């Protein structure tokens, strides 16, 4: 399974621990969609921070994705829900290491 497919699967299942395991210890996840929902952008550094961040977001039902579709080997489109705001988004795996772990992933409004 490609890293983008694993990312979408973890997001759909709200698997914060599995999501964090997809990243290198110093992996970076940047989400720019939140500005469309009148929230601050997310810049999350490190797999432990990714785990804690999404544990909170999934646990309090403040983040989810719907209707994911793969665009290519590095990108997926979906509807991102930020606490009631739905935004069309595109996630891109920008960089992986030699083991296929994500070093950098960005999510932007489509």
Regions found by a protein language model. Give the residues of each.
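Short, aromatic-enriched amphipathic alpha-helices that serve as compact interaction elements
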Residues: 1-15
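Hydrophobic pocket/interface hotspot
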Residues: 7, 19-20, 27, 46, ...
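Alpha-helix boundary recognition
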Residues: 12, 20, 55-58
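A solvent-exposed, acidic/Ser-Thr-rich amphipathic alpha-helical stretch
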Residues: 25-68
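A beta-strand edge to alpha-helix "cap/lid" segment located at domain peripheries
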Residues: 52-110
